[in-house]
From Swiss-Prot:
This is Ectonucleotide pyrophosphatase/phosphodiesterase family member 5. Binds 2 Zn(2+) ions per subunit. Residues 1-24 form the signal peptide. CDD domains: Enpp. Keywords: Glycoprotein, Hydrolase, Membrane, Metal-binding, Secreted, Signal, Transmembrane, Transmembrane helix, Zinc. It comes from the Eukaryota. Its main location: secreted. One of its GO terms (molecular function) is NAD+ diphosphatase activity. The active site is at residue 72. Its EC number is 3.1.-.-. One of its GO terms (cellular component) is plasma membrane. Glycans are attached at residues 101, 158, 292, 329, 362, 369, 382, 389. Its cofactor is Zn(2+).
Amino acid sequence: MTSKFLLVSFILAALSLSTTFSLQPDQQKVLLVSFDGFRWDYLYKVPTPHFHYIMKYGVHVKQVTNVFITKTYPNHYTLVTGLFAENHGIVANDMFDPIRNKSFSLDHMNIYDSKFWEEATPIWITNQRAGHTSGAAMWPGTDVKIHKRFPTHYMPYNESVSFEDRVAKIIEWFTSKEPINLGLLYWEDPDDMGHHLGPDSPLMGPVISDIDKKLGYLIQMLKKAKLWNTLNLIITSDHGMTQCSEERLIELDQYLDKDHYTLIDQSPVAAILPKEGKFDEVYEALTHAHPNLTVYKKEDVPERWHYKYNSRIQPIIAVADEGWHILQNKSDDFLLGNHGYDNALADMHPIFLAHGPAFRKNFSKEAMNSTDLYPLLCHLLNITAMPHNGSFWNVQDLLNSAMPRVVPYTQSTILLPGSVKPAEYDQEGSYPYFIGVSLGSIIVIVFFVIFIKHLIHSQIPALQDMHAEIAQPLLQA
């Protein structure tokens, strides 16, 4: 009877432990989508029913402060690293690295030079190092080998590939036999049209409506694939856009000799590399050049921009006021819409919306930083974050309080310039699970030892009788 009781107890303890594990959910799935240049208030310029559908059944952040400079590549890399540009190294769309004597430009193949990207580790690599798989459809940097890795699946950048084809690939990767848990999707508009038309143009209305239809298509495909209720969808952007005009031009040729400097990056933040021996002359000429141009020595750049501690940031930074355009002369291209300005300006701010099992419903939040997205992603994916400048605490109120955990999310304790110090509550929620598992394991081990011990003791008399019986001589007939 005692033996049966111990056996039943052992089974119950084992079941209790297995239940502890089985109560943990499947791996969270995340799809991060960027509509390039989608300014925060585009949501209200024309009817955007699909964006508002996500706002109603998900979360919305009204003000997202991105990083300086407010350009495409620096901010897309910030979204997936949680770092300021000075820390992740992609400081502009066009750069020069004086240490390696190498250039980086969107228009050239040197964007595939891994060394430019390896001052940071993007989230798809961290996700894969944790044993998971990632898929990227045109997200900037995902077709570059970084730290000897690509995403598990990726589409080499080709702007002619339709939004629908990009969505099809993402759906395919999420529903394959070995599904991804992290997807990244990028679309070039409304940025392209915002540059050509200007954000205040009435012609931007149809462009925004088209983006809303594309979002509607994505939602439809996720529902068709039965992913809508299981996947966490995050919709964001890299920057906004502001209106420019031909009356607000700053021509560098009026103030500087072309032979005295190299213009590394252009409007509205001009990165200027003076020729040897010409620094003071160039700096003084620019300082008094134009009332709508503010000029900084690299070491004097305002701390709030976090834009001085990197060798790829040039010795002189000239920043135009909002709506003003810097060019060498009027023969250069002029854009009716532009971005790159001070990240404190509202017109530079992008959108942020999210929907999924991890997020609250019909919840609106006033503000966050774009650096905060990275620790949020790590939390959702249950992976340990690399050192970053964001704060999970700033965005944890976006989450459903019942959101389950699979493994503990750990925010790095390594602080970078401008970082928010990790707090004890960043770890909150992971301890009960491990305490439960530990106690369950101890109970099972104790019951197992007692059961085996009892089993051995109960079998000793039978073994002695068997031994005695074998030892008896065979009776002769």
